[in-house]
């Protein structure tokens, strides 16, 4: 594995009902600190349905770029579609760091992604 291909700090920005969760904004702050130390950028991963309008708020809280995956099957959290969508982002973008909040959703999603990526 060529680690030089991996760069940038990615944050899973959890939203429910079209409202960003506080943990997403908190993680963007931490991601900004990490990215600054590594001379990299912060990418927010936003999944859901009709959520693109939340991108501006994510940029205002420290995201350099926002990757939006908008699909009706992502309107409410379900394990497999969210896991697959983020796994595809990770495979394509090759982030050096991925931050996921320690919420109920994050505790379901994080280990599944870790198992698929490794």
Which stretches of residues belong to each language-model region?
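N-terminal glycine-rich FAD/FM-binding segment characteristic of electron-transfer flavoproteins
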Residues: 1-117
């Amino acid at each position: 594995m060529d680690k030089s291909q991996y760069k940038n700090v990615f944050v899973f920005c959890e939203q429910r009902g079209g409202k960003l969760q506080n943990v997403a904004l908190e993680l963007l702050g931490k991601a900004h600190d990490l990215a600054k130390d590594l001379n990299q950028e912060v990418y927010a991963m936003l999944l859901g349905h009709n959520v693109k309008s939340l991108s501006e708020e994510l940029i205002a809280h420290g995201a350099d770029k926002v990757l939006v995956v908008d699909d009706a099957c992502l309107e409410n959290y379900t394990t497999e579609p969210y896991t697959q969508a983020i796994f595809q982002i990770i495979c394509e973008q090759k982030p050096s760091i991925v931050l996921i909040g320690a919420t109920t959703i994050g505790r379901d999603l994080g280990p599944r992604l870790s198992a698929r990526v490794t």
